[in-house]
Regions:
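Active-site neighborhoods and metal-handling regions in enzymes and metal-associated proteins
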Residues: 1-361
């Protein structure tokens, strides 16, 4: 195994590289996305696809629609021939015309905030029928996840609200022709697992915005600086976060709080900085010290025992990654240099990102 000579040293500060100018997805890119999804439906033998979206679970819906419906639920009902219906609540009905693909809107007030005006003329079942859902068709349902459990029937796990799933079942007569179709977006060869040049530029804006924010927050670190001041460096340009912003000094989650407070940085504190936008997140964790003598008792070999091995693994990752490499190959290479039994990591050495901080692994 290749050995690395990792040393703590001063180096020039990396330049910030966010252009500050979001890159829009072109019409050609949206058509390419639609073509990929329709081909995936054909490969799965699906006659219809129902894609769910809300503020927390928006990526698959937004992939074709171009926007997400914030505080309301929504459905994109896509037929194999490309015909689309947008099932929208009160405050998103006026955005049907803003969708990046052509389609017809169906107004479902049940998707709206509590106590807003409700339609009294049709049930949810009737409105889903109006959107084209019908018995006898093979229908894929995409919520957020592509399930890969070794002990569950993944095709029959549906991660959408029960009241919507119940109404779909009422139309179709049960689950027989309903299948989880998260793999069309997130599975091996899924539509969202590869990007064209336009998509890469689109996502790079968010990734660079996040890394610039972390760099500025690190530059601000000093005894007496409040977590809120650090957090102000992380959230920027009014963009939508893909992950909870973290600016923490010392103990975290006091009284359940996850967000920056007026607590200030103290010498010897653990520091956590994280921010993410569509396209990527950046995170740094370390100690607020000037040298090893200020590290807490029992952690004075932190650089040698933790930071240097992690940096070596990161270097290995960058050197080894290449087109055609399997996730298993990368996993083994990181396991070799940073064994889980010693360092205690438990997820994986890398994952895909998009609108979500974690798309799939």
């Amino acid at each position: 195994m290749k050995q690395y000579d990792i040393r703590l040293a001063k180096v020039p500060q990396p330049p910030k590289d966010c252009t500050g100018e979001p890159v829009m997805l072109t019409d050609a890119t949206i058509q390419e996305r639609l073509d990929k999804v329709l081909q995936g439906m054909k490969n799965r033998g699906l006659e219809q696809l129902v894609v769910y979206g809300d503020a927390e679970h928006c990526g698959n819906f937004q992939y074709l629609m171009g926007y997400f419906t914030r505080f309301e639920e929504a459905l994109l009902v896509l037929d194999a021939n490309g015909t689309a219906h947008f099932v929208l609540g009160n405050e998103n009905l006026n955005k049907a015309s803003k969708a990046r693909i052509p389609g017809q809107a169906v107004h479902v007030s049940l998707f709206s905030l509590p106590n807003q005006p409700n339609r009294a003329d049709k049930t949810l079942r009737a409105l889903l029928e109006e959107a084209g859902i019908a018995p006898g068709r093979r229908i894929g349902i995409t919520g957020w996840k592509h399930f890969t459990s070794p002990v569950e029937n993944n095709e029959k796990l549906f991660d959408i609200p029960a009241f919507i799933l119940d109404a779909i079942r009422a139309v179709t007569g049960g689950d027989e022709n309903l299948f989880n179709a998260g793999d069309l977006f997130l599975g091996e060869g899924g539509a969202r697992t590869t990007n064209n040049a336009n998509e890469i530029a689109h996502y790079e804006y968010g990734a660079a915005l996040a890394s610039d924010g972390v760099l500025d927050a690190m530059d601000l670190l000093a005894p007496g600086v409040a977590e809120t001041a650090l957090g102000a460096q992380l959230n920027r340009q009014g963009q939508h976060n893909s992950i909870v912003t973290i600016a923490a000094s010392g103990p975290r989650f006091i009284k359940g709080n996850m967000f920056p407070t007026q607590n200030t940085v103290k010498v010897g504190d653990t520091i956590s900085l994280t921010v993410g936008y569509p396209g990527g997140s950046s995170s740094r964790a370390a100690y607020a010290v000037r040298d090893a003598s200020e590290l807490p008792q029992g952690a004075q070999d932190y650089v040698e025992k933790v930071a240097a091995p992690y940096f070596a693994a990161y270097t290995r990752w960058l050197e080894e990654i290449h087109v055609g490499m399997t996730g298993g190959e990368m996993f083994d290479k990181i396991e070799e240099i940073l064994p889980r039994a010693v360092y205690g990591w438990s997820l994986c050495p890398g994952h895909l990102v998009a609108e979500e901080e974690w798309l799939c692994s």
